[in-house]
Amino acid sequence: MRHIRIISPSSAIDAQWINRAKVRLEQWGFDVSVGEHAYGNIGRFSATDEERIIDLNNAFADPMVDIILCSRGGYGLQRIIDKIVLPQRPKSQWPLVVGFSDITALHSLLSLNGIPSLHANMCKDLSLLPDDDITLIAEKEFLMSADCPTPLSFTSHLLPLSYHPAPHNARTPYTIHHMSHFPLNRNGEVLGKLIGGNLSVLYGLQGTPFSLNKIIEQCSEPPILFIEDISENHYHIDRMLHNLRLSGIFDKIRIPFSSMYITD
């Protein structure tokens, strides 16, 4: 039975979302444990920096943990990312980290070390989404894959519909189909390492050892950049994208792939 550890490395979360996600994951057949400080609430954060570091490092160090599910994003990982102690064992035995939003900082750290991770639903979505939600179905099948956390090969009609485990270190093909009501979209096929995550977090990591430029330097070929964000003003999105452009990032990637919910 695969073991999932739920931790809260960023903002505080209502305990009900952890508890309801835990029930659903156990119904899927997972053994689920919760980090010592996951239910905490100290101002904006789930716990102090030191306590959140302890939960992260304990989860990485525990050889029984197969998957680390971050309960929510928000803010907080950038304060502690340089204090995380990565596992001292073969990379094929590292736990798979799952999350999005602020968890992008942790994905960036793992990308720098050549470790695949999963940008996917966290506790609240795992609690509320219906069983037939396509992102939930994809996440469930991904997590239950016998070869997880090796890279996967999958095809997509805007969202993952079907996929199969790929050999370790294999490149992951990803097909994005044209949406006619978006005139700037183009059909195409691209192969490469998928990097990125939340644009605001990536922007905040610029100029640090965990920046996109540092990640791209570790890639043997131009990677695919994925970016997403929510509730940001148009001008702020524009500022962040031009920051990446002026940093030379758009000259080093194969294709930008993004999802945005922008406010006026």
Regions picked out by a protein language model, each given a short descriptive name:
Residues V32, I67-L69, V98, I224-F226, ...:
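Structural motif
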